[in-house]
A protein has these predicted regions:
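Adenine nucleotide-associated cytosolic modules
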Residues: 1-212
Length: 212
């Protein structure tokens, strides 16, 4: 009986990570370590190459100049029959949304105005029946409370308001410290660590709900 239960707890489904920078890498590292469940496939989407500012990558053994999206393949030593990394070394645009195939889609793109493309990704994922989570302000020194709740539940968060203007008003989870550029605080490794934990846990729960 116990053996049968253990045998049934195998990886299932797919989680897509849209954006694989400092936060995405942390989430990816968590996901590849999950056992007795978790994703069968992890899709990684990012068109950028690693440079000298990507310290968390070089600390983990990455080479400057290699694609960020390829790096999780190097770290994941699982047999592909157990867990497969699908690396897509390009940024998601309105023209390649069909590359996104995850049951759960976690969006952590940064730099500039990312709201319009994030909204398109969310809408595309929802059309496919996928569940979604993204960030909306993750600044802070590291002792902030990380909130994870539906977009419909937030107040006084300009990033959330902008996403709502793009038509995302419900059935989308947001992870945030509620600290933004306006608050003049840094983004520390401690904050990224905690946000990554919350996004990982939430993504795994969403995936489990899809298959149980």
């Amino acid at each position: 009986m116990i053996q049968e239960i253990e045998d049934s707890r195998i990886p299932k489904g797919r989680i897509d990570l849209i954006g694989f920078g400092r936060l995405g890498l942390r989430i990816g590292i968590h996901l590849i370590q999950v056992h007795r469940g978790g994703p069968k496939e992890i899709g990684v989407f990012d068109g950028q190459k690693i440079d000298g500012g990507d310290v968390i990558f070089t600390m983990k053994g990455a080479n400057i100049g290699e694609y960020k999206a390829d790096f999780l393949n190097k770290l994941c030593t699982h047999d592909e029959n157990f867990r497969k990394i699908i690396s897509v070394c390009e940024d998601i645009t309105p023209d390649n949304l069909d590359l996104i195939k995850g049951d759960v889609v976690a969006i952590q793109i940064a730099g500039g105005n990312t709201i319009p493309i994030a909204a398109k990704i969310i809408k595309h994922a929802h059309e496919r029946g996928a569940k979604t989570i993204s960030t909306a302000g993750i600044f802070g020194f590291g002792d902030e409370t990380i909130e994870v709740k539906d977009i419909s539940e937030f107040e006084d968060n300009p990033a959330v308001d902008e996403l709502r203007k793009e038509g995302i008003t419900e059935n989308h989870l947001i992870a945030t410290t509620n600290k933004l550029l306006r608050d003049h605080e840094p983004i520390t490794p401690y904050t990224l660590d905690e946000v990554a934990k919350q996004i990982t846990k939430t993504s795994l729960k969403l995936l489990k709900d899809s298959y149980d």
